[in-house]
Amino acid sequence: MKRILFSILVLVCAMGVKAQDMMVATLQSGEESKVFYGADSFVEAYNAAQTGDLITLSPGTFNVPTITKSLKIQGAGYIDDPDNGSYRTILNYKLKINLSEGNTDDFLLEGVYSHVDLEVTGTATINRFVVKRCRFDNVYFSGSTTNGSRLEHCRIAGYLGIGTNAVNFSVVNSIVRNMSGNTTGSIIVYRNSIIHGFNSYYDKIVANFENCILNGSSGNFQHSYLHENSVVKNCLSFYEGMFNGVLSKENVWYSNKTEIWGSDKGYSDTDLYELTDDAKSKYVGTDGKEIGIHGGDVPFTFTPSHPQITKRDIATKTSGGKLKVEITVEAQEN
């Protein structure tokens, strides 16, 4: 992190804001900036936004709108990190996104935590939809065709359902508890990701897997749900037989969690899943780096890539009916 990139002094009406109610949403629309405060600030910023605008959310818990515009929405991260003075942005309801025709390109959601779902629906084709460094219970794509879309550095604590209309959809350096089935009409790539379970009764999993770590079954389902048309390169499974039905595979391995991680691990919202030294050298990806979330072109991190509000100093007294608020903004070096 670059320490204290800049500070913003904001004067707000004393009647309109309290120290304990300082969730902040900033809206950047062209050259114009607006600041909104409180639990409804995300909703208010969204209502004022135009397609392509940027909304930045501070730490805190926010009410959520139903999204129909293509925006860039960036939170402070999905993990509390008190040692570094950073706290998460929490969405307190299911986030529903239904992008309308003409508002479907280049949507970005980054750095938010939700204990419920992200649901992307609609009929319009969605291009370059990106979810980055977020945590959700379940993520579902249904109805819309997604083209060139991406999940990166995410944690999915429940189910990931990419759906039947995905074209060049990639899941990169992410951790997924359960993966739902899809059809051969979808083109999906999992790269340097950890899949803890498969939940597929009717449709087998068909995708390209590269440099991934795969667990076995989920619940009462059987073990291997990889479709024969899947492509597997430099992947490891904890279940012997996971790759048996796959026709195109190279450099596949079987091992156990203790050899790979040093202990028996399941899904976690906080574990970094670092490989043991032996596993790092023994199980190498197509790029010569370690398999799993710390390899590849974009090694795992939970720190948002954009400047974020990490400190808010609020004056205890008003001056001329105004309350002085100092906001400190920091950003990751890369």
Question: What do these predicted regions represent?
Answer:
Residues 1-23:
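Bacterial Sec-dependent N-terminal signal peptides
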Residues 56, 66, 72-74, 108-113, ...:
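Extracellular beta-strand solenoid repeats
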Residues 60-61, 77-81, 237-243, 278-282, ...:
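Acidic glycine-/aspartate-rich tracts in secreted/extracellular proteins
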Residues 246-303:
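C-terminal accessory segments
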Residues 289-323, 330-332:
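Short, compositionally biased P/S/T/A/G/V-rich stretches that sit at domain boundaries
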